[in-house]
Amino acid sequence: MKIAVIGQSLFGQEVYCHLRKEGHEVVGGFTVPDKDGKADPLGLEAEKDGVPVFKFSRWRAKGQALPDVVAKYQALGAELNVLPFCSQFIPMEIINAPQHGSIIYHPSLLPRHRGASAINWTLIHGDKKGGFSIFWADDGLDTGDLLLQKECEVLPDDTVSTLYNRFLFPEGIKGMVQAVRLIAEGKAPRLPQPEEGATYEGIQKKETAKINWDQPAEAIHNWIRGNDKVPGAWTEACEQKLTFFNSTLNTSGLVPEGDALPIPGAHRPGVVTKAGLILFGNDDKMLLVKNIQLEDGKMILASNFFKGAASSALELTEAELVTAEAVRSVWQRILPNVLEVEDSTDFFKSGAASVDVVRLVEEVKELCDGLELENEDVYMASTFGDFIQLLVRKLRGDDEEGECSIDYVEMAVNKRTIRIPHQLFIGGEFVDAEGAKTYETINPTDGSVICQVSLAQVTDVDKAVAAAKDAFENGRWGKISARDRGRLLYRLADLMEQHQEELATIEALDAGAVYTLALKTHVGMSIQTFRYFAGWCDKIQGSTIPINQARPNRNLTLTRKEPVGVCGIIIPWNYPLMMLSWKTAACLAAGNTVVIKPAQVTPLTALKFAELTLKAGIPKGVVNVLPGSGSLVGQRLSDHPDVRKIGFTGSTEVGKHIMKSCAISNVKKVSLELGGKSPLIIFADCDLNKAVQMGMSSVFFNKGENCIAAGRLFVEDSIHDEFVRRVVEEVRKMKVGDPLDRDTDHGPQNHHAHLMKLMEYCQRGVKEGATLVCGGNQVPRPGFFFEPTVFTDVEDHMFIAKEESFGPVMIISRFADGDVDTVLSRANATEFGLASGVFTRDINKALYVSDKLQAGTVFVNTYNKTDVAAPFGGFKQSGFGKDLGEAALNEYLRVKTVTFEY
């Protein structure tokens, strides 16, 4: 059918895309005018497809349709109007014009909750069922005949966002497509809306969202969640307007210890606790609010409302005192040598061993059914008094660490809703940068802004290092066993796997990674890396060494491998999450704490990773993430006296500067993975089909943004022309396109500056006399797309023969048949030595060449075959130190020698 889509937002965009995939012809997209220079997603998508787009600021004047608007609409010849989400008033001349009329999506089960704030009122009224309706438009307000309805359960703590993201958005898109399909098949019903149960409520605005405290707790809870996030339920307290978010009902009946917050009109004062703000209804029942927005717009954890409020010991209720005495009896049974267990009794000083810890934990868990208690809790609260305080906090659901408030950027993309933190991550909290400084991170697929990201300053680096140092020296990270540390890393890997599709989607958005590749490599290998190093945690061990005895006495000498302390990890933009994982997994497995500086142009998966560390239970301060510039954040990390190790992946030029800074500051330990110009030698006796396939992968894998990419191919003369012919044939089959499309082979380059460098690189190659066989230009479409490129006749003196492109540019040079030593000399005539490769069926030749190639990795009859268990790192100016494998652990450990005499 010929369809006019009238609406806006990501929902409108998705409906538009799905209708086109169904084979319908969208003849026009009608959306709202650009706001602050930013076009609506529906309009952007339609313009990209060449569909006419109209952005009328109004459709009628003085109650009459504008003739010009009607004429432009009628010229399209639409057979059906589809209104997925439309905030404008559309004249009946337009509504009734098509052969099949118009259908509208409404996010409630009509006739209930007619009006623009239907989702809000579904929650405010405490409806147990929610859903959406698709109806035939008429001249009433949401009164047209019903075509289709779908319902879902409304969860007790659902908010507008959670209900929309879980059901109304994804299922609503499917519902609109289904409705159009029914119309096309002539099977669409027209069911009059019943009058019984019909309601209409007005638009929820800030001025109408004030909380009425004279009602039960459940009604207050429904009011808060029904206005979360927009417009926000508010009250006046402490001489300012406070807006409440993230409400849950508290059914425990126990009022946690906290500080009173007087609220005018409330039945009782609120109580600020470590879990959040306890509020009371007029029925004396409670609800808990996790987040508060202050009058100046700043969002804070409700538990932090009274900054500087001292933490005091909990006063136990009668029931809790009974529990405490039962636990005292458990301690007494485990510690028979202790006459009487007092608050000051120390579990371990009283003779308990690790096996007793297990017994204590299991007995207490059985005593307190449903309690989550772990071995490390005993080590962190080893006296009876501290243990009871910890136990009661857990029983009350009052987490001592507190919960992190995350201001997400939410996006509906790749058939899912992704939630991305965008602030700095310091000491277990997402916070704004000093001075609230931010910058834009760009989607390379179309050049659009994804979101604003906090831009770290020097003071932020100092705060992050201080948090990491405190976590290392005083926190529980250094006190838990190596095996428990491994368990936390395994849990983190599991969470990364649970979020694998979301992480891959973020990599595609932020870095231009092809989604299908990101699932397997960018994210898949990241998960494997954390699992691999989690297994190493309890296998890091020293040795005993026989030395000359100090006769007549004897000696025992042993070594211990210890973490170095606070580490700075500076990662590149080509594999944002994988490069983070390669270094951070080994760093954490060794017992260090870390400050991570992601590449400024690709910060988002690092911030999502930070969120997952919290969910995994990694203690606060162990992992910190600072998006920002290398010249500021990276430099401060290199200079900081409390940072003991820098792990860096990037250019040789910057690596040299970091090495110098580390030496001058405090002689930091350094590992560097730097530039490359990896040679790939293809002999005439190779399997040519495999050589072509792997040669393509060696250059074009991940758009050529690959540190070990084959920077130069040496092809034996007798097969050179056939090799080039086959490569060009394969290049022309590659699909360049949106990285989220499942059939895309080649996505956009990472950022605009890099695209421009690739253009200059190819222009210089042509200027110096190399033959440009194909490619060499930007793809004529929005975004930072560059054509897969092939150069031949490349001589050793040329710029492109010596310098890395870091892009999809294949550099091919000939070498004379049988001249193995000369081609080896040419391959090694570079200051780089990251990787290399050889293709031959001759095992003797393969062994000889692999011996002679001066590179940290040599691939024989394969390429790009890295593995988490195999050490990875370069020679010469490609750096030193290893990622992956057991060798990587040594980069984050120091060896201590201990000698006894007896």
From Swiss-Prot:
Gene3D superfamilies registered for this protein in UniProt: ACP-like, Aldehyde Dehydrogenase, Chain A, domain 1, Aldehyde Dehydrogenase, Chain A, domain 2, Formyl transferase, C-terminal domain, Formyl transferase, N-terminal domain
Primary location class:
cytoplasm
Q: Which residues carry this modification: N6-succinyllysine?
A: 38, 660, 767
At what positions is Phosphoserine found? 9, 629, 631, 825
Give the Carrier domain ranges. 318-395
The record's GO CC annotations read:
cytosol
Give the residues the record marks as binding NADP(+): 571-573, 597-600, 630-635, 650-651, 673-674, 757, 804-806
Specify where the region named Hydrolase domain lies, as residue ranges: 1-310
One GO biological process this protein is involved in is: biosynthetic process
Cellular localisation: Cytoplasm, Cytosol
Q: Which residues carry this modification: O-(pantetheine 4'-phosphoryl)serine?
A: 354
Q: Describe the protein's quaternary organization and the partners it interacts with.
A: Homotetramer.
Q: Which family does it belong to?
A: In the N-terminal section; belongs to the GART family.
Quote the protein name from its UniProt record: Cytosolic 10-formyltetrahydrofolate dehydrogenase
